[in-house]
From Swiss-Prot:
Residues 420-616 form the RdRp catalytic domain. One of its GO terms (cellular component) is virion component. May exist in multiple phosphorylated forms. This is RNA-directed RNA polymerase. Its main location: virion. GO terms for molecular function: GTP binding; RNA-directed RNA polymerase activity. Residues 950-997 are annotated as: Disordered. InterPro entries: Birnavirus_RdRp_palm, Birnavirus_RdRp_palm_sf, Birnavirus_RdRp_thumb, Birnavirus_RdRp_thumb_sf, DNA/RNA_pol_sf. GTP binds at residues 256-263.
Amino acid sequence: MSDIFNQQGLKSKFSNIVKNEGQGDSDIREVFNELARPQAEVGRDIEYSELSQALNDNSVKVFRPQPYDELVNIPFIEAASPRMMALYGELLDSKDVSLPVGSGLHIPTYKPGHEVTPPLLTLPNSLSYEYMHYIANSANDTWDKQIYETLKELLVAQATNRFSTGSLLGQVKRVAAGQDVAYGRKGHHKNKSFKEMGITPYRVMEWLDEYMPISDDEPEITLSNTLDWLVYTPEEAELMGVPDSLPDITQSSAAGLPWLGKKKGEVAVSALITANMLIKDVSQLLKENLFTGSNNPLDPKKEGVAEVTTKNPRRAADQFSRQVLDRIIKEYSYTMMGLLFPKGERYAIADHLTKTRNIWSASYVTHLIGSTISDQPAKRMLNVLTSTSRTPSLAKFSPTQGGMEALINIILNATDIVELVYADNAYIYYPNEDIWYSIDLTKGEANCTRDVAMTTAMYLLTRGWTSKQGTPIYNYTWAYLALYGIPYMTVDSISVLKNFQIKNPGQGSGNPWTFLNNHVLTTILMNKWSEIGKPQPSPDVIEKLASMTGIDFKVELVVTNFREKLIAASRHSIPTSNRVEPRTIVEMDMLGWDVTHTEFGFTPVLSKERLFKSIACPQPPSSTFQTSVAKQVHKYIQNVALLYVGAWAYPCIAQTIEGYALNHWNTINIMIRNKEYDLDKAIGKAVEASPFSEVISLLSLDRPMHEQNYAQVLYQQKTIEKKEAKPKVSNPLYKRDKETYHEYTTRMARMRINDDMVGPQWEPIINLVTKLYPREATGENQKSRESMTRVKIRGLLENMERQLESNGRSMDVWYNAYLTGKKPSGVDKKLATLLVLLAPKRTKKLPSGVYQKLLGYPPIDKSPVPSLTSDEAYLYDTNSLEYNRIAYVSKLNEDDITVYANKYMVYSSTLLSNLLPDKVDWPELRSMNVEGASDPYQVKGYKKKELKPRFGEEILDDEPTGKKSSSEKRRLQRKGQKAKLQRQAATGTTFVRKPLN
């Protein structure tokens, strides 16, 4: 290395390149290190003792602290439902679970740490070495200068930025800035309700049909039960092909409240039980309110969402919803609390004390329920490339494997204005003016209102959780959780910092619906922009739209002569293997990507600002990478990812990053030599933790990633499959335009009587009941009918195999009944009827994916509807029959929620998602003044008699005894039950835990 730095000819060549900067005689290493040297020190942060003053100085709203029941350890076998015992009984037989059911009350305290990570200190010297090699072999002065300017940008990025978790003061100022946006302070526009904007949820959903389309495929599950039914036993998992249908959970992420300090993987079963407690409580409360009143099945009070008045039924719906929310939040206050977590990011040193991005780390319970509602619809979202109908959506868009090429071709061929939308980002291209705009909402999360979240929920339910015929496959419990529960828990909710409970403006960033709600906001903005003629976003237009919608936004990037620059890039196409010639890279800022042209067509390159900050200020490995080998694997994947997402496009930088990756790989090989170490597992974990995991996961683990032909894998164009979006159908379950609410409820009640159980999966059961038990099946007493149906069918199914065995028969009898559709001879008449009715109808028009799931491998015939060999047909028929048998048995043994709710699934869930009140009177929390307070317990609003010390902490005491409301009596009754539960758990006394509902 010393030889190349001391070659006089190269030193002179470098001096000529930098002579205009007054550094002509300097050594290149000195120049590069000087460029990377920070010009300012990181500012001093405040202490936690100064937090109350900082909150007050920045006018941050603080709530009166809400307590929740303390955690207690309870033996798993005493807290688990029969389903949970079937799933985890053997594994957790002697273990405890941690549940928030203690008799004491707890107020959380959370103090996140803030740390600044040093930059990549070897970067200046490594770049100087590669650059000297570059100019030694270069005969093009223009290229030499251009490469130097690029390296200079990278080094300046290192001088001015650091990877850190920000500062406490930066967190406060970020919250204050969000409140400024939400409340219209300091020049911002106050958030507006839909009524103030002149729109309705139904109008917005019509826009979302175009801006956030969902495919016509049906979800893999029904949204109708507690979460433990989405986890499968080994037998069920073998048939389903997956261990569970829960949303993907990052096990290493924080569990949130009430499990403060724990990872999700550590409390997964406890969280599942607690979430089920909440779901059951909501179900019970809805039963008490929905299905009470007269015995007349057409009575609105019995079948409606509240006591309907002829004047304003929507107000009744609002009153009903508020009552349920009040009771739920008293028991589960932690579900609307999020830890205010400082996001690790590359921050400008100058912004250290003013800008720290906050992540709202939701309760695991809130995360589970919210993700379950959104997961299946989100998987089926379509975008501008995958939808057969027009959409500007970029949801699930990937620029790799031909995605960028296809998108750029749409832009190049455009004759009308092109608009694209992704979360809080929008992109507009004006072909006549040849100008590209990248637009970003100003702290978009703060613009989110509960109107927006309710509309998101209604869209997910009516588009994502309906059959192809438009029939709901969700019940009223989940409809309520989606429409009222999650919006209340995640929007204008509580952020915990120290022992302060801060009003979170808008939605908590990082909640399960962050992307969806932001996408709805941008959809509203873009449609209002369309209404005024789609003008270019000048300052006057921005002000006009912000005044109309209450949504503040800014133009992040303007690219003039955009098409011209793209065409120039295509004419200057350079192969990905060329790491000598500077490329033509066109700025787009499209989801963080720019574009160049290679042998694969238009190819994505990570935007320079993001790429250079990531190289100069690498993110340190998290605490989950504990061993020295794991940390090396993390650094290896980090450099491989940076090389493949963009560093490859910049000479000298590509060689530097490739050298780092190779060094880390060699170090790993030395460290694991003569040791047993699962390197593939470690690499997989590092890939999963990478911010570029979607890109890097396309590569193989069969050989070192730095040795693979990354360009062939990442950028080779592949066929993009297009799908039909869910059509806009005339659904008989929706209220008709000229129909009064009384007429609607009457019609729906009649429909409920005629259609007790919906969906083809219920047809055999309906037929069975009708034929075998006509009196019970057609009886007017609906409660008796439900009980009789459930008991009789369950009994028959449980005894079916035993009856066959007692007659010397096997399950082949059922199989033959399935194939022939005829009742088997020599079997009891009722049993023979049952065997035929429970045999699913066979079809020869199923897609190959269904055959693959039931065969266990793809059919040899590659046609969309494959023909099967006789052996394959037998295997398919047998597995199909067994799958349906297990599905029926599981459905009939489900928790009481589904058994009860399926009868009313069509009617009640449709009402909940169509009878939205004009304005919801959400329960509001009390705020308090923090001026001059050292802790939130001593401020005005608390009386000393309300506080008492327990275990060294100050907590709320019971209110004085007196006349109490029914809801308060219920809360105290449950508190007494929990106290008994806690005492028994502490003494080891055996007890049976009663279901909450």
